[in-house]
Amino acid sequence: MNQSRIVINTLVAQRAHEEGTSQLAIIKHLLPLGYRNFELRREYFNGNFAELEELAALKLKYRLVYFYSIPENLFVDGHLNIELLQFIAEARLMGANYLKMTLGNFDGHNINELQRLNRLLPDSMQLNLENDQSLANAKISRLVDFFRVANENNVQIGFVNDLGNWVYTKQDEQDATRQLLPYTRYVHLKDYETDNGINTTSFVDSQLDWQKLLKQFAAHLPVALEYPATIDELKNDLNVLNNFVI
């Protein structure tokens, strides 16, 4: 796989975050790996806008690309999330061009709210929705219906296929991938183990047929690693992905 497609989600440094390391410091620690695409997690920020400005400076210095993961629903009580402009402002401040949220309670009748997205979202930003670990936000038929309506109304919004999340909603990842492929702009690659509940793990030596899954996606789509890992584990997994031939 072309290295330029690979994204590192800061969840890989979960332990460092739990020990108080800032997201800025996490990115600086990961830079020597040689990758330039990073997914930043909103829940990892401490509310200090100075950190966002420093991340923007870091982006310019090293020519980084930022993806912004926002653990919030796009639709709340049938309307666009009232914090959406805040999320966009944060993304602008740090220089993130890709936003990720979850669907929320869109019911097909709030078309006017959906169309507002074209006015609110800057042309330089791409908004994508992810299947999380809840059936409310990850039911395949519901997601397909939403993206169909969005397309019919010329609303530019895409899908993030989190391959390791389908197990939480007891849906088949192969079927989900096939049905949502026309809308997919981004992929999260991880696996799960079920020895003690369901836990997120590396895709290497996984229960998922990740090779078969990845071969279904367009060759330019970004692929993010999103699971806790040590630096040595991360290096190994990045090497496996780099050597994967589509």
Residue ranges of predicted features:
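Active-site acidic/histidine proton-transfer and metal-coordination neighborhood
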Residues: 65, 75-158, 168, 237
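Catalytic-core regions built around general acid/base machinery
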Residues: 51-62, 86, 113-120, 145-149, ...
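Hydrophobic residues within beta-strands of alpha/beta enzymes
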Residues: 38-39, 99-101, 127, 187, ...
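Short, electropositive alpha-helical surface patch
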Residues: 56-65, 119-125, 219-220, 235-246
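Active-site-proximal loop/turn and secondary-structure-junction residues that shape catalytic pockets
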Residues: 12-14, 42-44, 70-74, 103-107, ...
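Generic enzyme active-site microenvironment
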Residues: 37, 128-130, 160-163, 224
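N-terminal pre-domain/capping segments
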Residues: 1-82
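Histidine-acidic metal/acid-base catalytic patches
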Residues: 1-31, 89-95, 140-161, 167-246
